[in-house]
Regions:
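Active-site-adjacent C-terminal substructures of enzyme catalytic domains
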Residues: 1-112, 119-123
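A general structural motif at alpha-helix termini
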Residues: 112-113, 132
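C-terminal cap of metal-dependent C-N hydrolases
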Residues: 118, 124-139
Length: 139
């Protein structure tokens, strides 16, 4: 994605200014915590996503998509060690990250479940209420 600059704002700034729905990788690797909170305050229906490219993998160097990558903690980089290639953060990790940033349980649940269903126009999933399909698990 293009960088956000004051004279050439790019897609991210447009989402902040005009977005009704937008997704954000809530791994604190792709997006800094301060930027994530700013987006949360600016975009009414911001929802969390994760690429989880190496979730569950041990730290180390491995082949992924025809390239050598390095996994260290939650961060995945190309072999040069600086170019971000992904993260190992699951949606549960993203939920925990949102809580760690000060969002309430309800706000974090909305960002990791409810809003995706709303975006897709699904009325019977993503929430716990009468008539909704039961898809709950204990965290």
């Amino acid at each position: 994605m293009s960088q956000m600059e004051h004279r050439s704002p790019g897609v991210a700034a447009y989402a902040l200014a005009k977005g009704r729905f937008a997704e954000i990788i809530s791994d604190l690797v792709h997006v800094d915590a301060t930027v994530l909170l700013a987006a949360y305050r600016a975009i009414p229906r911001l929802y969390a996503i994760t690429d989880a490219t190496a979730a569950g993998m041990p730290d180390g160097t491995f082949e992924w998509g025809g390239r050598r990558v390095i996994k260290k903690g939650q961060r995945i980089t190309l072999e040069n060690g600086t170019t971000l290639a992904g993260s190992a953060v699951t949606m549960l990790d993203a939920f925990r990250n949102l809580i760690s940033l000060g969002l309430s349980l309800e706000q974090a649940a909305e960002m990791t479940s409810t809003r995706q269903a709303e975006y897709l126009g699904l009325q019977d999933v993503g929430r716990i209420e009468p008539g909704a399909r039961a898809r709950a698990f204990v965290l």
